[in-house]
Amino acid sequence: CAPECRSFCPDQKCLKDCGCI
């Protein structure tokens, strides 16, 4: 996922919209 998404989900799988699984 994109870096800005990782800040939201550091140790979860990120979705394309930066959501978490």
UniProtKB/Swiss-Prot annotation:
Please verify whether the record's keywords include Secreted: yes
Recite the UniProt keywords alphabetically: Disulfide bond, Nematocyst, Secreted
| Chief place of localization | other
Q: In which tissues is it expressed?
A: Expressed in tentacles.
Q: In its keyword annotation, does this UniProt entry include DNA-binding?
A: no
Disulfide bridge map = C1-C18, C5-C14, C9-C20
Query: In the UniProt record, which is one GO cellular component term?
Result: nematocyst
Task: Give the UniProt subcellular location, in the record's own words.
Answer: Nematocyst; Secreted
Q: Where is the signal peptide?
A: none
* Role played: Peptide of unknown function. Does not exhibit antimicrobial activity against Escherichia coli and Staphylococcus aureus. Promotes cell proliferation of human fibroblast skin cells. Does not exhibit any effect on voltage-gated ion channels, including potassium, sodium, and calcium channels.
**Protein known as:** Peptide Hact-2
Q: Which organism is it from?
A: Heliofungia actiniformis
